[in-house]
Amino acid sequence: MERIEQVVHDCDAPHASARVARDTAARYLSAMKVKDADILIVPGYTNSGPEHWQTRWQSKLSTARRVEQAEWSKPVREDWTTSVANAVNEAERPVVIVAHSLGVAAAVQAIPQFRKPVAGAFFVAPPDVANPEIRPRHLMTFGPYAREPLPFPSIVIASRNDPFCAFEVAEDIAAAWGSLFIDAGETGHLNEEAGFGPWPEGSMTFAKFLTDLKA
């Protein structure tokens, strides 16, 4: 099935609109194919459920695996970053990180511990861990974010009505990291509760992102 696993299995949507996304994405021929990378799925606070887009992608991408955390509901920064770093350092191929929410914070804070190459990172809905109003409050222990370019290509996708991060804050974070910033419109936290099980636009964007990475 290659071709970015048939563009994340026909853009991960059973509806006609997904056919359009698939046809657009399928035009891209990959410089980096799924088989060339270890794709690390890094969920956020409380993990990603069975219908979450991360879980769906994991089931459809042959080299994808989840970074598991010992405690999903009471995250400890050191534990989470160590889990991410261990997954990167145990990889046999260049790594592509696919992180959502607090998983973005964990991945970014783990960078100093990386000993293996990371080809790129696909970051969705990063939380504002510097905001004292964030709940639960212990999520602030994952901040502050480094304000310097990341050592690998990255995309940040953010919503205009994310309850965990103001749009302008996400845009500023992406600029500091040197990330390509994508405005997802009013899409909540881009999670299961916001309707993002099937996510054809995300699948298409991820497929294009992989084509732009070096194998």
For the regions a language model picked out, list residue spans one by one.
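Active-site catalytic motif of lipid deacylating hydrolases and related acyltransferases
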Residues: 33-93
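Catalytic histidine neighborhood in serine/cysteine hydrolases
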Residues: 176-191
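Gly/Ala-rich beta-loop-alpha elbow adjacent to hydrolase catalytic centers
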Residues: 98-103, 107
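Short beta-strand/loop motif that positions the catalytic acidic residue
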Residues: 156-158
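Active-site nucleophile loop of the alpha/beta-hydrolase fold
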Residues: 69-70, 122-130
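Post-His helix in hydrolase/transferase enzymes
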Residues: 193-205
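Acidic catalytic loop of the alpha/beta-hydrolase fold
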Residues: 161-165
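Conserved hydrolase catalytic core segment
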Residues: 109-119
